[in-house]
């Protein structure tokens, strides 16, 4: 497997196809995750999204904040995203490694959504502390993963991606307990409600954990 699956194999048009699903339940998951963040925005926030892909979530949230910056490791994603976001003047997508963040400014809201802790292969507790360093006083970080109640729909969605040739064939002997493994080496883990609570507690920051739509689990960390 290549070092970064999303940068090398699942980017731009291929990543766009991931979200063109035939499953209404999966579409509701996409919408509910965004809606949870949106209800915390008042229109004045400076927002950063980590692992933003081609800007799918950015486009939905841009009307609800002052401006939104997204970073992604893939130049192809950013090139595709510039066209995707062409009519969104307060959104900017840039190439940056989420493990080597280079910002002089801080943000009111930092997002790490769509199971980003797994996709970016982070050490969750260490990365939460890095994220909080990007937040202005009074700001929040939103980190999401999958609810255990969404497992069957999530698995069907990943089978759909494999059938489209976007992922390798799913290895059903190894796929279990919130972890999806493909025969091409791709692996997607999960942070459960219990995991998120443990991370939040160990971080030392004010936090809450919420299940949304029985599809997402959110860790919301506040910087005072």
Where in the sequence are the language-model features?
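Conserved class I S-adenosyl-L-methionine
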Residues: 1-42
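Class I SAM-dependent methyltransferase SAM/SAH-binding core
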Residues: 56-100
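A short glycine-rich, Lys/Arg-flanked "PGG" loop and its adjoining helix->strand segment in the class I
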Residues: 125-137
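SAM-dependent methyltransferase
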Residues: 142-199
């Amino acid at each position: 497997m290549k070092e970064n699956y999303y940068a090398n194999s699942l980017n731009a048009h291929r990543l766009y196809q991931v979200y063109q699903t035939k499953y209404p339940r999966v579409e509701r998951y996409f919408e509910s995750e965004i809606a949870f963040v949106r209800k915390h925005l008042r229109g004045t926030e400076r927002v950063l999204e980590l692992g933003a892909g081609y800007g799918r979530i950015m486009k939905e949230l841009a009307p609800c904040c002052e401006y939104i910056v997204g970073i992604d490791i893939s130049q192809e994603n950013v090139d595709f995203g510039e066209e995707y976001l062409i009519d969104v003047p307060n959104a900017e997508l840039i190439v940056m490694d989420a493990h080597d963040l280079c910002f002089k400014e801080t943000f009111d809201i930092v997002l790490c959504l769509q199971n980003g802790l797994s996709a970016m292969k982070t050490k969750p507790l260490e990365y939460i502390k890095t994220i909080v360093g990007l937040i202005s006083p009074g700001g929040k970080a939103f980190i999401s993963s999958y609810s255990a109640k969404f497992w069957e729909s999530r698995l069907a969605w990943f089978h759909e991606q494999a059938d489209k040739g976007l992922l390798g064939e799913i290895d059903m002997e190894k796929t279990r307990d919130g972890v999806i493994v493909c025969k091409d080496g791709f692996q997607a883990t999960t942070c459960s409600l219990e995991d998120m609570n443990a991370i939040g507690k160990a971080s030392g920051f004010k936090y809450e954990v919420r299940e949304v739509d029985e599809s997402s689990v959110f860790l919301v960390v506040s910087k005072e």
